[in-house]
Amino acid sequence: MTEVALSLDVSRFLRYLGVERQLSPITLQNYQRQLDAIIALAGETGLKSWQQCDAAIVRSFAVRSRRKGLGPASLALRLSALRSFFDWLVSQGELKANPAKGVSAPKAPRHLPKNIDVDDVNRLLDIDLNDPLAVRDRAMLEVMYGAGLRLSELVGLDIKHLDLDTGEVWVMGKGSKERRLPIGRNAVTWIEHWLDLRGLFASDEEALFLSKLGKRISARNVQKRFAEWGIKQGLNSHVHPHKLRHSFATHMLESSGDLRGVQELLGHANLSTTQIYTHLDFQHLASVYDAAHPRAKRGK
């Protein structure tokens, strides 16, 4: 079987996806792009028919793709397309088993979240309160850092979600999971300051944080305002809401060491999601060790 014949089988598969599965043209183009790349790799390995393909050859496709600069996420898509194609060939009786079934792409490296150190957080929060919107922004910053909220949770807060007597808020997290969180004395103070001014913008809106038009503030507006305050306050790194959430988690873990507690505060379903912050904590401790411990100093 020649490369042309390999392509004919792929064309039959794409026709099946378009006619019987009724996949969108964009999805079909993505399948074709990935499978065309596989056919090119098959030509490099001397593969003459799909029936000759085994797990070792599929792994060689993966290795060659990586050498050509394909990232882990893109390689996972390529192998997924190949598995679907082979499943179809099995259903047509043209293959006995799917040779790509047990072959997976290497996992993409998990990037450690960046955080803002405590001094910079304090500098960020010490903003010039020359207008009501600045008071609102200070309250949002205090709540975001004080409770480690997601951006969607912050903009979704209603006044009814507050219990300022206990210093707590109710938030609706991912998967419609509700949780009750302490927000800290500073956040309570600045929410109260904002509530004193909030009536200048709207009186019948349920949302806690409003835009200058009196409607619930948008996530994009929050991102824009936080970035602007980061620049005004002279922070070297870009300030965005998720970075404040990361900073909350890192600083809490450094202070308490209570991974389970931080998991509950962040609303993570799995502890493994929270454990990434232990790497940040270790990096901090390692830098302190390298700077201070006599045995860590080189050449002495």
From Swiss-Prot:
Which gene produces this protein? xerC
Q: Where does this protein reside within or beyond the cell? A: Cytoplasm
Matching InterPro entries, A to Z?
CB, DNA_brk_join_enz, Integrase-like_cat_sf, Integrase_catalytic, Integrase_recombinase_N, Integrase_SAM-like_N, Recomb_XerC, Tyrosine_recombinase_XerC/XerD
Biological process (GO), any one: DNA transposition
Where's the active site on this chain? R150, K174, H242, R245, H268, Y277
Bilayer-crossing regions? none
The molecule here is called: Tyrosine recombinase XerC
Q: Which family does it belong to?
A: Belongs to the 'phage' integrase family. XerC subfamily.
Q: Where is the Tyr recombinase domain?
A: 111-290
